[in-house]
């Protein structure tokens, strides 16, 4: 028999008005191209920065590339890990897989994997001849992009590898532009001294073909008020980087009100096309206020205020929410779903077993009343009883199901799979759950439960599923 399911208050139905779903979204958003081996199916990269190294080495970490197919993740995999004796700047290589990104770095028409450790970064490329590391960069621990992002960020040809970088007491944005060998950071236009970067995401909000960066960070000094801010950065390569403020302490009310951005130190951001208009939208989850906010993209850039705000406290407590957050089209209708993790949620009496909520998108934004609640014990409507249990596992205390989430179309059917990490499961070895996309949302008849032992990874220090490529 199945364990008792989470029951959520029916009051969630009052969180949003009834929304109609007009046809004709401008653009689907099933997820990025992560087909590394060129077989027509997207693949998944999983970072395991705490994985033990070879005998006599530190916990040097690794990256497992798991290949997709018509039935989901296959048994085929490629493991990237430091070789014995690997050093970076005179220090042992460690924490490989702490951050991941993907882009066509060498302009050969095929997606490459970018992964970093504490002191180094490398780009791996797949060709018909096999896999090769085409770039390797060594840097100091305090000059590494904390969140890897890759793609076209400036107006010059070539792939950029950039991200927010956290130093001892400072924060900046920069990296390698257009395959340059030089690491470049530019100053902020208002001479701000920023610190405590907590989350970042990239996407094309204005539809100009270049990516923007959204980042949650604290302002320590400089022009403006102190405290957590949500900033939008357009072209971080430009001298004197411009910061567009979308939220700050002065825009916060309690509880968060419609039309006001309210970033906190625990806010998480992601991007995707929620309303199907061809522009990415900026989504922010703030666990401490149990709120979800969306800034809609448009040709002139997003409005300074969110176009959608909702109180999530009827779905989960603030202590349960986060940090998992992903945006992508699960049902193939052209409107991206928002998937929220509640990794510390109590499920079937088990503390911190974890759950995720899949919130459909529409032409008018998220549709909270049609959300699905997913645990290892079942799937069903929020506020109701689970109707099916496709995951061949049960919730256990401390699993942290929903700690990390990504949405990728592994099967090639135009519908994104929701891939959920439970990194603390089975004593820390971890697990992935692949929830298949379907026309009605997450498929309730079948799912994949992926254990690292399937790929020869048997350490209880793997925390498999804690870092996922987005």
List the model feature ranges, each with a label.
Residues 29-41, 97-105, 146-154, 159, ...:
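Beta-propeller blade termini
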Residues 50-55, 120-121, 167-169, 219-224, ...:
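Short glycine/acidic-enriched loop and turn motifs that connect beta-strands
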Residues 57-62, 120, 225-229, 289-291, ...:
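A detector of repeated loop/turn-to-beta-strand junctions in beta-rich toroidal repeat architectures
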Residues 44-46, 63-66, 96, 113, ...:
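Hydrophobic strand positions within the blades of repeat-based beta-sheet folds
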Residues 27-79, 86, 100, 162, ...:
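An edge-strand/N-cap motif at the start of beta-rich repeat modules
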Residues 38-47, 107-116, 155-164, 207-216, ...:
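Acidic/hydrophobic-patterned starts of short beta strands in beta-sheet-rich repeat architectures
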Residues 13, 17-30, 67-95, 123-147, ...:
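Blade-edge motifs of beta-propeller repeat domains
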Residues 1-11:
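Bacterial N-terminal signal peptides that target proteins for export
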